């Protein structure tokens, strides 16, 4: 009897894990509906776990494109370029195309020392966190896409009111 209960428990646990994995897979949108990358471009996909409506609503995603370059230790570097938001016709989804001329700006401090290989990003985009939909980004070959996830804490804070003096 104990063996039968143990086998039944193992089977049920296996089924639950399988169903859970299938549900997570089914929630994600197939990225094949997005256009194939044009020549010289790479398609990047950001997929994040779905945390339910309440869990997703208090998060944001910041993503940025850039490339690794030899830089000095004391100047700040930034890549020129911007993201263009496009609509996936017939689906109601959006995707982003990163466009750049490859120019890099920097501060002009005098630095001595070794060069180091650093990721130099362009201006970032902040968007809603949605664990059910991937974020699709196209960037030129030689560039990479990175992202950060921001999460709001449940605490809220009161702003201070400022009294205005009368001018009478």
PLM segments and residue spans:
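N-terminal export/targeting and maturation segments
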Residues: 23-70
